């Protein structure tokens, strides 16, 4: 019930605590702006799942509360704080083919989309042993540049525990089936799990592929 309370009331009379949080975030982002750093910013991601307070448990039949909070945050950072170094990333969780309104865990990836004027890039998260992105056709229809904001082996598959997920297959899958994916972000490992690239097989092969641009290949001009 905490989630229901927070998402429903956060914008009714914006609380001092909420605004202090946004101010602190804005302060850090301003430092990056002043240093010439552009930020891929994906606030309140995986909103179409149940595990965060801003997720569907707080508004099961209506995405409007999430959309209002996202838009208000966007306007606060962009207009009031002048943070023109932010690239806004809409980052839902993959539905893994379970995007029905009656499903307890997921809503469709575009269910809480805040609108084209509030999103620059769409980059969902996706954890699948076969490296499939079931929502890719929907992402294409949404008409924005695409990325993958979190990937790794399935949470209930064999690779998560033993670190034998073959990363060399990722780039081949992207080339063949998901060519609009422009970047990806690996999740980290923690005790008992092997999510990260370095914890699995053939990360060096993946990063050495000519299709991949690494950090050292980029023309950094930050002063």
Predicted regions and their residues:
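Long, well-ordered alpha-helical scaffolding segments within enzyme catalytic domains
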Residues: 21-27, 61-81, 134-149, 159-177
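Alpha-helical scaffolding within the catalytic cores
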Residues: 24-28, 92-113, 128-139, 164-173
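Aromatic-lined carbohydrate-recognition surfaces of secreted/lumenal glycan-active proteins
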Residues: 42-44, 70-107, 146-154, 186
